[in-house]
Amino acid sequence: WKKWKTDYHAWLNSLSRLRSGGKPAVSNAMFGLYGLLQQFETIQKKLTKERISEESEKIKGHTEKDEKDALESRILRGTLLELLKEVEQATRDYALNSSLGNTAIRTQKLVQSVETLEELPGLLRLNLKDVTALEYFFLKVLRLWSQP
């Protein structure tokens, strides 16, 4: 997860040079976005699987299929929400600790990024796929942080 956050910070940093970098910078930003999505999904699945196996051991054999499905769904959502909180913290850390300085524009970008992240739980409750919701966030962040 630490590597993911480092990659995320590097991706955010590259967005500040997007306009001056030409087509290669744009393609790198897009490939970076989908690389981060893939890594995020892999991490989420791994954490969820570990937590499900831990919980399943606690309630061995005493549950029906419906109860087990509900448990798995709850763990999946809980893990995702926990990771989204950490994405918010990583975005905040980048915005406040960046070498580019803490300007009013950076603060506004941070606020808009966090607002977008806060929309995701509602979209997920409406059965939007996890990866699609996160893709929405990353595309919005790409647009926000690539602006001068």
Set out the residue ranges of the language-model regions:
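Charged, glycine-rich active-site and insertion segments that engage polyanionic ligands
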Residues: W1-E86, D93-P148
